[in-house]
């Protein structure tokens, strides 16, 4: 039995506190699309995705209207393309292989535009130990792909707790990010490239979503969003002890997650596919009040980034997970609090006033998901420094048995004090300083950082 107060509370969450379903993401298996002939491969991919996803946007909109809950993004993720290119690329020169990979990426982009989804993820390679020849070609093709597509997202998993860190891949990804920044407007291509440690197979969020090899043929995964709701709750708890704050956040996360599961299951049922998971991640937007940083400040920090930020974030992340896990048996993806600088109005302000630096963000990634996200750095930053930043973040994920990632944007012609405007969900990125001391010798060593002792769990 619902009481009027609960109904009013739900209306407030949606109308005034920016509560929404951030994404319903359709995962599609493409393993059965592989073919020696490039044209047949592209045709198979087109037929498979459109057969499952042709009505995704229409269905999500219908469910959104039925429940009065906004579904902000409709997206598609596919099997990592690096896993299905082997037979197609056999016998081709390196240049031909790169072009073939890009053609597949363009096919994905055309499909995304035809079915009306915001992004399509899965232009991906899983190279945590070593890369196959086709995966090397796919990685090499990423900068060119970003100049020719609008909606395709690329991700590369270069480390896991079980495998260690592939430092050859880390070095290469620094170079790929640098090259992409130089050939796409305002380095926008870099906003669609993520480097992972312990990448989840069922992540609904971009730019890191792909349909993992262990998944079924098609599945709907939902991602919720509710920083504004959590902030409103915390602001009512002035003077309460931190345990009480945690408990109230937990209750709020429960309600948010229930809504996400309801909508996700309904969309899956309408499409005739399985329901996968709800991702519990609190995902901010550039909208005022829809900010993770503002939640931390409501807990008691003058500015996000000051001493105590990591502790407050750890409490927030844990409370969200506990509340969400109670609300759903189908929790997965990244499931934490996102801290993307350019997509969070409070984070942007904290950087601009000098409260939040790259080193503090790195510490914060130890206790939340997912990593250094949407970080803009000076365009003059060398590729080796980008690789070293990636390596540090991969080490945090590997040792702590958690997902970490890096989405970093070296913006040509920009330096500390400048900012770059992307608009929409990508927001505004203030340029953050990086160390001027070199890490080049470390990165040039290559090889593999061995898996840590805590990987031996059997």
Swiss-Prot record:
Pfam families xrefs: DUF711
CDD domains associated with the record: RNR_PFL_like_DUF711
InterPro entries for the chain: UPF0210
Gene3D superfamilies, per the entry: 3.20.70.20
Stretches of the chain forming a coiled coil according to its record: none
Cited SUPFAM superfamilies: PFL-like glycyl radical enzymes
Source superkingdom: Archaea
NCBIfam families hit by this protein: PRK05313.1
Family per record: Belongs to the UPF0210 family.
Protein name: UPF0210 protein MmarC5_0151
